[in-house]
Amino acid sequence: MFKKVDKKASRTKRHLRVRKKVFGTPDRPRLSVFRSEKNIYAQIIDDVNAVTIVAASSLDKEFSTNGGNKEGAKLVGAAVAKKAIEKGITEVVFDRGGYVYHGRVQELAEGAREAGLKF
């Protein structure tokens, strides 16, 4: 018999496996990505102090036209990078959140790189 694969559970397991290795420090914080069906969210987190330093999402007013599509994801990546550079952060560790590095997640990463963040 075939079992139906629970995509959310497998993503959560993947994320936990990746999070064992990916850790954000004050010098090099973690860029975390969350992708919902309609929107995309990114935040830069210092795991040592358990503080979110910078956050951006496709729900912000300036992204109302694109939403969570690829173009919107690229703009969110650029916005989070711009806010991070204003706070003096230039290097981050990329946490794809258990998602495949493809599509919207990839566009967010490329947008952040083009805006000046180093992974």
Swiss-Prot record:
This protein's UniProt keywords: Ribonucleoprotein, Ribosomal protein, RNA-binding, rRNA-binding
InterPro entries: Ribosomal_uL18_bac-type (IPR004389), Ribosomal_uL18_bac/euk (IPR005484)
Annotated Gene Ontology cellular component terms: cytosolic large ribosomal subunit
Domain of life: Bacteria
Pfam families, alphabetized: Ribosomal_L18p (PF00861)
GO process annotations (BP): translation
Keyword Ribonucleoprotein attached: yes
One MF annotation (Gene Ontology) recorded for this entry: 5S rRNA binding
Family in the record: Belongs to the universal ribosomal protein uL18 family.
Task performed by this protein: This is one of the proteins that bind and probably mediate the attachment of the 5S RNA into the large ribosomal subunit, where it forms part of the central protuberance.
PANTHER family for the chain: 39S RIBOSOMAL PROTEIN L18, MITOCHONDRIAL, LARGE RIBOSOMAL SUBUNIT PROTEIN UL18M
Quaternary structure note: Part of the 50S ribosomal subunit; part of the 5S rRNA/L5/L18/L25 subcomplex. Contacts the 5S and 23S rRNAs.
UniProt-recorded name of the protein: Large ribosomal subunit protein uL18
Source species of the chain: Clostridium botulinum (strain Alaska E43 / Type E3)
